[in-house]
Amino acid sequence: MMPQYERKQIIIHISCVIICVVVTLTLFHVFWNDNYIAVDVNYDVPYNFSVSPDFGFNTTNITWSLKPYYKYDINDLMNTANSVFKIWSRTGLNFTYIKNVDEAMVRIYFYRQDHNDSFPFDGKGKILGHAFYPNRHRINRGLAGEVHIDADEQFYFNDKLENMSEYDDSINLHAILLHEVGHAIGLLHSANKSSIMYPYYGGSKLGVDDFNGIQQIYFANKYKHNKIFTYNKYHKLETTSSSTPSYYGNRDRYPINKKRSLSSVFNITTTTVKPSYDKNNTFTPQKICFNITSSYKTHNTKLTAIRKYCTGHIDTISVIRGELYIFVDEYHWRFRSNGLLYSGYPLKTTHSWSVPIIGRFKVTSAFETLTGDIVIGVNYTTFYYFDRMSMQLYRMQKLPLHLLPRCRSTKKTIVFSIDSHLYALCDRIIREIDFNSLRMKRMKTKRSMLGFPLVSNLITVLDHDGIYLFRNDNTYAEVIRSRVDSSSSYFKNNTDKWTIC
């Protein structure tokens, strides 16, 4: 018979093994658990597009409708819309018109100016329309599947683009609807120039990427079990290399200073921009003239924020839905893609996002999740998640204290997004973290993953048409070929490019 002390030792050893296994599995779950949604991709064909299994309807039988607008002939509108849906039906989807626009899955409306969806139109020119992606997991439909067209525009009704010059400043409605309906049924932008979803005006024929994108969303999606639709060549299509332009990457982004651009709102809605604006416009904010009147003087916090802004002092800078946002104290500036400031700004951050904070605060980070929800980081460690459709606050998340254990102060931690990856940085310690849980994805993150050297005193990193580093001394530097630009004495004052007053 085994002595009692030996039995105790065996029990202790077994207990230690069990504890080690439990701890190991727990750490594995904490640090390697990804909340990303896997996207099924057909690797047998070249692809240049981004798809999400979230964006799409739960059926291939899709109803559509259009609300007439007095300015346009109803027959012209219906003929144009019918032509658009007939083209998209070549992908294997079945589109059916119904009279009641409120009951349709894809709904086309004409609106002017502010129309209560947080994306006001700007009158004739520039912004032509936008569309909201469908979401198969949403219980409430909301704006999903809606296409909004700026009713102040002058459209002509012709599905051929060869003779656009004959119509002066008129806009081809067929081209706009064809692209926007693509978004309304779930497609993001494509980097393939032959695609309808390429972010510039194109023809009226679907490209290979358009077919492949619909296949991945509706026929080869792991959430569905339909028979996979076989692509048939309805017309001759050019195939291109699967590589994408260097400026495009895997993001739904594109250069904003090119002619005939379709300006997109990333992962939520897409905005179509009239192609005839000044081609010399850049993403750099244009000069702003502030008239400090007595009304400003009664609001000391706003006056202080404006003075800080004009001297180059910012808390963070980010691109949200394709537009530049600069945050200073409790206020933020919002710029159009051509660098012009939206009317009425700066506004309090709580005006745009219902951050439940009483008293003074500052935004220290702002980014979008992979599914398009907007996250506002306040005072370094608190993050508020806003729904991509309703813009309602649905979650508050604290940055885990153990994330950067050697960080001397949480107020030195910055969170930023680069090329669809989220990072936390403190005292030159870098960790890739999960968009949703803010937990660590890797025990060790290589600095080379960032594509730029770690610089001290950073307050944020901006990734849009290049990578820019911002420091707490009101200066910035552009990263060129994975190096900080040394030809301009490294860092320049923010007032040279970003906060021009």
From Swiss-Prot:
<dbReference type="GO" id="GO:0006508">
    <property type="term" value="P:proteolysis"/>
</dbReference>
<dbReference type="InterPro" id="IPR001818">
    <property type="entry name" value="Pept_M10_metallopeptidase"/>
</dbReference>
<dbReference type="GO" id="GO:0030198">
    <property type="term" value="P:extracellular matrix organization"/>
</dbReference>
<feature type="glycosylation site" description="N-linked (GlcNAc...) asparagine; by host">
    <location>
        <position position="48"/>
    </location>
</feature>
<keyword id="KW-0479">Metal-binding</keyword>
<feature type="signal peptide">
    <location>
        <begin position="1"/>
        <end position="26"/>
    </location>
</feature>
<dbReference type="GO" id="GO:0030574">
    <property type="term" value="P:collagen catabolic process"/>
</dbReference>
<dbReference type="InterPro" id="IPR024079">
    <property type="entry name" value="MetalloPept_cat_dom_sf"/>
</dbReference>
<comment type="similarity">
    <text>Belongs to the peptidase M10A family.</text>
</comment>
<feature type="glycosylation site" description="N-linked (GlcNAc...) asparagine; by host">
    <location>
        <position position="163"/>
    </location>
</feature>
<keyword id="KW-0862">Zinc</keyword>
<feature type="glycosylation site" description="N-linked (GlcNAc...) asparagine; by host">
    <location>
        <position position="280"/>
    </location>
</feature>
<dbReference type="GO" id="GO:0005615">
    <property type="term" value="C:extracellular space"/>
</dbReference>
<feature type="glycosylation site" description="N-linked (GlcNAc...) asparagine; by host">
    <location>
        <position position="116"/>
    </location>
</feature>
<dbReference type="GO" id="GO:0008270">
    <property type="term" value="F:zinc ion binding"/>
</dbReference>
<feature type="binding site">
    <location>
        <position position="189"/>
    </location>
    <ligand>
        <name>Zn(2+)</name>
    </ligand>
</feature>
<feature type="glycosylation site" description="N-linked (GlcNAc...) asparagine; by host">
    <location>
        <position position="192"/>
    </location>
</feature>
<keyword id="KW-0732">Signal</keyword>
<dbReference type="InterPro" id="IPR033739">
    <property type="entry name" value="M10A_MMP"/>
</dbReference>
<feature type="active site">
    <location>
        <position position="180"/>
    </location>
</feature>
<feature type="glycosylation site" description="N-linked (GlcNAc...) asparagine; by host">
    <location>
        <position position="291"/>
    </location>
</feature>
<feature type="glycosylation site" description="N-linked (GlcNAc...) asparagine; by host">
    <location>
        <position position="61"/>
    </location>
</feature>
<keyword id="KW-0645">Protease</keyword>
<feature type="glycosylation site" description="N-linked (GlcNAc...) asparagine; by host">
    <location>
        <position position="493"/>
    </location>
</feature>
<dbReference type="Pfam" id="PF00045">
    <property type="entry name" value="Hemopexin"/>
</dbReference>
<dbReference type="GO" id="GO:0004222">
    <property type="term" value="F:metalloendopeptidase activity"/>
</dbReference>
<feature type="glycosylation site" description="N-linked (GlcNAc...) asparagine; by host">
    <location>
        <position position="379"/>
    </location>
</feature>
<feature type="glycosylation site" description="N-linked (GlcNAc...) asparagine; by host">
    <location>
        <position position="94"/>
    </location>
</feature>
<keyword id="KW-0325">Glycoprotein</keyword>
<feature type="glycosylation site" description="N-linked (GlcNAc...) asparagine; by host">
    <location>
        <position position="58"/>
    </location>
</feature>
<keyword id="KW-0378">Hydrolase</keyword>
<keyword id="KW-0482">Metalloprotease</keyword>
<feature type="binding site">
    <location>
        <position position="183"/>
    </location>
    <ligand>
        <name>Zn(2+)</name>
    </ligand>
</feature>
<feature type="repeat" description="Hemopexin">
    <location>
        <begin position="311"/>
        <end position="356"/>
    </location>
</feature>
<protein>
    <recommendedName>
        <fullName>Putative matrix metalloproteinase</fullName>
        <ecNumber>3.4.24.-</ecNumber>
    </recommendedName>
</protein>
<feature type="glycosylation site" description="N-linked (GlcNAc...) asparagine; by host">
    <location>
        <position position="267"/>
    </location>
</feature>
<dbReference type="Pfam" id="PF00413">
    <property type="entry name" value="Peptidase_M10"/>
</dbReference>
<dbReference type="InterPro" id="IPR021190">
    <property type="entry name" value="Pept_M10A"/>
</dbReference>
<dbReference type="InterPro" id="IPR006026">
    <property type="entry name" value="Peptidase_Metallo"/>
</dbReference>
<feature type="binding site">
    <location>
        <position position="179"/>
    </location>
    <ligand>
        <name>Zn(2+)</name>
    </ligand>
</feature>
<dbReference type="InterPro" id="IPR018487">
    <property type="entry name" value="Hemopexin-like_repeat"/>
</dbReference>
<dbReference type="InterPro" id="IPR036375">
    <property type="entry name" value="Hemopexin-like_dom_sf"/>
</dbReference>
